């Protein structure tokens, strides 16, 4: 059942008034594939626009906080924690992991996915002048805890 549709099939924001407040957490990932020279430039701190990982991390955190402004039926949430980690993976990939937490009545999957996505988009934006062929890939939810639907973890 699609919870964002009413009995006439119209979109609406789900009423969570009666849902219990529980601890909730979601972890999402994304990858940005690029030329080895581009990744080397980032890791060596030689990018002309500055510290790509630092800027992308802040963008991801800000995006998590702004998710309800971007996704129409998402509830505005009072996140209690957002963490974005970036790491070079091999010679041509940046791996992004975004983690969002709160004690609330609805999950934080969309916030974690938005954080990972905007982090990847920021890397693309900062590096497109030197590498137009970058690919953002594998944006997905890795794990979520809390709430009525319980625990979910992607299978390896």
UniProtKB/Swiss-Prot annotation:
Gene Ontology molecular function terms on file: cyclic pyranopterin monophosphate synthase activity
Entry coiled-coil feature ranges: none
Gene: moaC
Enzyme class: lyase
Pfam families tied to this protein: MoaC
Protein residues bound to substrate: 73-75, 110-111
Organism of provenance: Pseudomonas entomophila (strain L48)
Active site location: 125
UniProt xrefs under PANTHER family: CYCLIC PYRANOPTERIN MONOPHOSPHATE SYNTHASE, MOLYBDOPTERIN COFACTOR SYNTHESIS PROTEIN A
Top-level taxon in the UniProt lineage: Bacteria
Assembly notes: Homohexamer; trimer of dimers.
One BP term from GO: Mo-molybdopterin cofactor biosynthetic process
Membrane spanning stretches: none
Entry-linked Gene3D superfamilies: Molybdopterin cofactor biosynthesis C (MoaC) domain (3.30.70.640)
Reaction(s) this enzyme catalyzes, per UniProt: (8S)-3',8-cyclo-7,8-dihydroguanosine 5'-triphosphate = cyclic pyranopterin phosphate + diphosphate
Pathway: Cofactor biosynthesis; molybdopterin biosynthesis
Entry-linked InterPro entries: MoaC (IPR023045), MoaC_bact/euk (IPR047594), MoaC_sf (IPR036522), MoCo_biosynth_MoaA/MoaC (IPR050105), Mopterin_CF_biosynth-C_dom (IPR002820)
Entry's family note: Belongs to the MoaC family.
Keywords from the UniProt entry: Lyase, Molybdenum cofactor biosynthesis
Function per UniProt: Catalyzes the conversion of (8S)-3',8-cyclo-7,8-dihydroguanosine 5'-triphosphate to cyclic pyranopterin monophosphate (cPMP).
Protein name as catalogued: Cyclic pyranopterin monophosphate synthase
EC number: 4.6.1.17
